Amino acid sequence: MSHQTGIRANEQLAKVLGKAKNGKLRVVKVSIENEQLSCSATADVKKDWERDYDKLLGPLLEETVPCYILYRLDAKIPLGHSWLLISWIPDTASIRQKMVYASTKATLKTEFGSAYITEELHATTLEETTLEGYRKHKRDFAAPAPLTTREEELKELRKTEVHTEISTNTRHQTLGGISCPLTDATVAAVQDLVRGNYDYLQFRIDLEEERIHVSHAAQVELSALPKQVPEDHARYHLFLFRHTHEGDYQESYVFVYSMPGYTCSVRERMMYSSCKAPFLEQLAALGVDVVKKLEIDNGNELTEAYLLDELHPKKILHRPAFAKPKGPPNRGAKRLTRPSNEDQV
């Protein structure tokens, strides 16, 4: 199945989306009906966004029926108000529904205007669609606050203490390489990926503190994947590749290690190379079953054909028979041998 479903907004939805940008609508519910994006319901602004959230959102969601929700926040951006896009795809939805809604979300963002959508939430349970669920999502993904000068001094002091404390935040050497600790934000992002909030994560190694940070988390179309790969720095990438193979729908985690040649420092190349295997073990411990590990030096390599070929190599159905080599030329006539007297006895 292609990554673009061909589904587009109908005329009614196009008018509603245009009206929504004037700031009077709080909620727009969008459903896929008859192979079209259509407006199922709207709600006007009543109070502030937090007090409107559960009151307006709850009645619009059906327990087993997926939909999109465009929710207007009160924060302002240069274009107008910022919007939250909620993808409500319950676990009970069919595989086809999950595929169609996942593949059509980018189209909805384009129809509405991606610049207006400043936040996204992927929900599979009704609890995740509540205001508290949204706040928890924000807390889980919030990056840790930078250390104060005093905290930095205490950190350095602990490094010089006589006893050594080994924990998940301690870098250590393993047989497979160097295990760098993950930041809290990195762990939260991976957990969100497993829950379905994202399908793409990018990681960087802070060479000074030797920790792995999440540098980007999003829902990314495969066609836009090559643009995520930096041309001047190494990175790790984790992508949920949704595809069909021999008629079966599959979701496969693909891990990509990108290293743009010798534009990176020697230390950067060594760190990314040494940390890769332990990092994959950490991902496995967090519930990520990586099906394929790839190494590239250019983002343009990440095409659908390339990933399919790596995940499902083409089988050779016909093997030509091994041809018996010919003997050397000019061997002369075949010699006849006379039987000996012993053979005649």
UniProtKB/Swiss-Prot annotation:
GO CC field: actin filament; cell cortex; cytoplasm; myofibril; plasma membrane
GO molecular function: actin binding; actin filament binding; actin monomer binding
Subcellular location: Cytoplasm, Cytoskeleton; Cytoplasm, Cell cortex
Keyword set includes Cytoplasm: yes
Region of interest (Disordered), residue spans: 320-345
Domain of life of the organism encoding this protein: Eukaryota
Transmembrane segments: none
Keyword Cytoplasm: yes
SMART domains named among the record's database cross-references: ADF
Gene Ontology biological process: actin filament depolymerization; barbed-end actin filament capping; positive regulation of neuron projection development; regulation of actin filament polymerization; regulation of lamellipodium assembly
Domain ADF-H: 4-139, 177-312
Entry keywords, A to Z: Actin-binding, Cytoplasm, Cytoskeleton, Repeat
Functional summary from the UniProt entry: Actin-binding protein involved in motile and morphological processes. Inhibits actin polymerization, likely by sequestering G-actin.
Family stated for the protein in its record: Belongs to the actin-binding proteins ADF family. Twinfilin subfamily.
Oligomer and partners: Interacts with G-actin; ADP-actin form.
PANTHER family recorded: TWINFILIN
Entry protein name: Twinfilin
Organism this protein belongs to: Drosophila pseudoobscura pseudoobscura
